[in-house]
């Protein structure tokens, strides 16, 4: 973008005509192929969530439209705009650095990183809805980063030598639990009067909890996609293997409802497939060889055949949920070599083992196993080529 256009945009900002500056950006996105400099993308991100800008104004609507257009037109994505590193190129810098929206008001000049933002959201603040609207867009940026940019942006968030990995896992898991107190706003230190901490209220709705859980699960999947793995198996003593062990540790501390929420939000992801294997193998003490490719599911199922349950009662419940998750993954597969008879036998054996075990709070997983059995039984009788 040439300096004349920057001057027009920043003159509007300086004269308190923010809507006019956004109109210029909207026009450029609609009619030209000119990439939007990172400083103006950061301005839109900031305006969406900054407490000093009301949610009901046209400013938020314009910023949301601009960011959505950037996502839809992938060629216009400037990943540097979403990084918390401030070494931008001259073209990505504003013409006038002194303007508040580029300096002390800007989200990217605050003393926070990406995981601090997720931690703030997981504390269910009163402005959670604003942050969720932004994070829906941000999540799409990270998904495109994984697909087309080699997860370079996520790697920046994880820090050198993955120093942020444990904090990222802890914060993502906080999206599945209810906090007692709202954290300070990411803008607290730069505002003239920092908002006081308050008890969480009004943001613990079912919708808010579901959206946060979905966010936490998707971020974990994006971290998993970033981590190097072996050709077919997750190699021991690697970051990927360490990641699964930390997830298992955190997952075991969730209550039954939270565990169901966690696995449910992982969907049909590769992370769910691999984590299920880790939990199963650890539970019965066999060598942990996690196959992250699904092309030979029958071989992996043979290795995991249920001959015993973990001795620990808590691990028994985790074990059952992991089986439900692992077998559920198989129902989505279209592998020609899929052995339905082995699957049916495994499922029946597992169901029988748990029927004979006295465990409290496993009704839902048992019901899912029963539904699978019925489905498989019908499939066998009708001789269908595919289970589903």
Curated annotation (Swiss-Prot):
Keyword field: Chromosome, Cytoplasm, DNA damage, DNA recombination, DNA repair, Nucleus
Protein localization: Cytoplasm; Nucleus; Chromosome
GO biological process: DNA damage response; double-strand break repair; double-strand break repair via homologous recombination
Top-level taxon of origin: Eukaryota
Keyword DNA repair (UniProt): yes
GO molecular function terms listed in the Swiss-Prot or TrEMBL record: chromatin-protein adaptor activity
Record Pfam families: Nse5
InterPro entries on file: DNA_repair_Nse5/Nse6 (IPR014803)
Residue stretches spanning the membrane: none
GO cellular component: cytosol; nucleus; Smc5-Smc6 complex
Role according to the record: Acts in a DNA repair pathway for removal of UV-induced DNA damage that is distinct from classical nucleotide excision repair and in repair of ionizing radiation damage. Functions in homologous recombination repair of DNA double strand breaks and in recovery of stalled replication forks. May prevent formation of excessive Holliday junctions or assist in their resolution.
Complex formation: Component of the smc5/smc6 complex which consists of two subcomplexes, smc5-smc6-nse2 and nse1-nse2-nse4. Interacts with nse6 and rfp1.
Protein known as: Non-structural maintenance of chromosome element 5
């Amino acid at each position: 973008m040439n300096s004349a256009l920057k001057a027009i945009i920043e003159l509007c900002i300086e004269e308190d005509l923010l809507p006019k500056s956004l109109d210029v950006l909207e026009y450029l996105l609609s009619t030209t192929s000119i990439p939007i400099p990172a400083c103006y993308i950061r301005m839109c991100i900031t305006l969406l969530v900054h407490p000093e800008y009301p949610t009901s104004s046209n400013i938020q609507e314009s910023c949301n439209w601009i960011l959505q257009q950037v996502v839809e037109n992938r060629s216009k994505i400037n990943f540097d705009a979403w990084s918390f590193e401030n070494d931008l190129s001259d073209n990505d810098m504003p013409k006038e650095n002194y303007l508040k929206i580029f300096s002390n008001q800007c989200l990217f000049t605050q003393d926070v990183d990406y995981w601090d933002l997720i931690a703030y959201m997981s504390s269910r603040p009163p402005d959670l809805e604003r942050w969720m609207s932004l994070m829906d867009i941000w999540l799409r940026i990270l998904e495109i980063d994984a697909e087309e940019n080699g997860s370079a942006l996520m790697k920046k968030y994880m820090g050198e030598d993955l120093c942020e990995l444990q904090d990222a896992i802890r914060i993502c898991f906080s999206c599945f639990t209810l906090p007692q107190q709202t954290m300070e706003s990411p803008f607290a230190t730069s505002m003239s009067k920092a908002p006081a901490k308050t008890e969480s209220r009004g943001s613990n709705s079912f919708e808010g909890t579901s959206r946060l859980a979905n966010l936490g699960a998707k971020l974990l999947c994006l971290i998993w996609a970033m981590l190097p793995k072996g050709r077919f198996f997750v190699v021991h003593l690697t970051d990927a293997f360490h990641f699964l062990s930390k997830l298992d540790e955190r997952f075991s501390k969730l209550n039954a409802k939270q565990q169901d929420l966690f696995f449910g939000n992982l969907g049909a992801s590769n992370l769910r497939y691999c984590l299920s294997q880790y939990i199963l193998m650890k539970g019965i003490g066999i060598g942990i060889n996690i196959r992250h490719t699904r092309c030979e599911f029958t071989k992996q199922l043979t290795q995991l055949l249920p001959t015993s349950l973990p001795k620990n009662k808590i691990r028994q419940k985790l074990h059952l949920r992991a089986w439900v998750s692992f077998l559920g993954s198989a129902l989505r597969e279209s592998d020609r070599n899929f052995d339905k008879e082995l699957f049916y036998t495994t499922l029946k054996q597992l169901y029988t083992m748990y029927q004979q075990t006295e465990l409290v709070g496993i009704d839902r997983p048992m019901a899912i196993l029963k539904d699978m059995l019925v489905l498989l039984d019908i499939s066998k009788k009708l001789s269908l080529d595919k289970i589903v």
